[in-house]
Amino acid sequence: MASIDELVEEIGKLTLTEASELVKALEEKFGVSAAPVMVAGGAMPGAAGAAEAPAEEKTEFDVVLKSAGASKINVIKVVRAATGLGLKEAKAVVDEAPSTVKEAMPKADAEKLVKELKEAGAEAEMK
C-alpha cells in the first residue's frame, strides 16, 4: 500500500499540463477513455421520476480551444489572463488544442472568454 500512497502523492504534485499529458498517455497505453460513462435512465431506481421532470437549463460551461489560429501569441496571452497559468502552462494548453481552457464557468463568463479567444484569432466553443 505504501507504493500506492507514494504514487498518489507524486500525481498530486503534477501541474495541470503534466496531469493532462499523464491522462492522455494512460488512455493510449490501456486503450481507454477518461470521459464519463453515461448510465441508461431505466437502470437506476427512482430514475423514472427524474426522467419526467423538465430538463434543467445548463448553468456551467467549459470553454474549449479548438485551434489557436495564426496569432498563437495573442491566444496564449488570453489563456494566461483567463486561467492564471504561467507562460509555459498556457503555451502547452494552446499547443495541445483541442483542449479545455477553463471548466465550470457561468454562462456569461464563458461567452466572454470565447469572444476574447475568437478576437485573438483562435477557434473556441462552449460545451
Curated annotation (Swiss-Prot):
Recorded GO CC terms: cytosolic large ribosomal subunit
Taxonomic superkingdom: Bacteria
Keyword annotations of the record: Ribonucleoprotein, Ribosomal protein
A biological-process GO annotation: translation
InterPro entries to which the protein is assigned, alphabetical: Ribosomal_bL12, Ribosomal_bL12_C, Ribosomal_bL12_C/ClpS-like, Ribosomal_bL12_oligo, Ribosomal_bL12_oligo_N_sf
GO function terms (MF aspect): mRNA binding; structural constituent of ribosome
SUPFAM superfamilies recorded: ClpS-like, Ribosomal protein L7/12, oligomerisation (N-terminal) domain
S-S bridge residues: none
CDD domains in alphabetical order: Ribosomal_L7_L12
Described function: Forms part of the ribosomal stalk which helps the ribosome interact with GTP-bound translation factors. Is thus essential for accurate translation.
Family: Belongs to the bacterial ribosomal protein bL12 family.
HAMAP family reported in the protein's UniProt record: Ribosomal_bL12 (MF_00368)
Record's protein name: Large ribosomal subunit protein bL12
